[in-house]
């Protein structure tokens, strides 16, 4: 809900069968309707790649490349240059399952578009820039066997194996993902006896209301705020500012991590209908930047 409301990128960490893929596939249904300008840009990208389908007009694109995809498949290339999966997901969702299994070059290629919303391709004497303002939804197991921290099965991996597996994701890439959450597996009894959850339409309505607040205030989603605009639109209370500073110092966050948590806190405040970011909003945002080895 927070990711949909603010346009934030999301990393889900959990054992096999915990519902990560299902959550990602349902995510596009929580996003607000596409404005006509966004629909035209998305259609232009699809047309360049020969994938435009009139039946998909004004529907947010959802890309799900396999983890064997190369960096060129993700960012684009060729002569003349054609857009890759990240540009085809412009104004939509890019779902990367089994994130550490992607080639390192492909993962590092995500850093530029996650920061700027564009991707530059240079091939021989040609240079092309494509839009790539997508929402990254990534999923991964916490370790090679998948069951680190699971309540249902014991993990078979050594600490060294876990460290190597999680080390496939670089710090700069993780820095650019706003929300890091754990998706625990439920015992069969709890799963079968679980009460009905909220409907997609109810959650989508709340997300749309929060997104509308942000658009009226600053003209873009909270995740798209850059530089001084972040501080200008934050409206932190004194207690919230103090808590964020203490958390950033204690957890050793970079300036980028701190700003990304601040943007998440702004979205949480919007969902609560609050003009000011309070300490409770910051405390919740801090919880969503989990360190993988703590999972």
In which residue ranges do the predicted regions lie?
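Basic, amphipathic alpha-helical bundle interface domains used for macromolecular binding and assembly
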Residues: 81, 104-295
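Conserved inter-motif catalytic segment of the P-loop NTP-binding fold
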Residues: 38-70, 77-78, 225-229, 234-235, ...
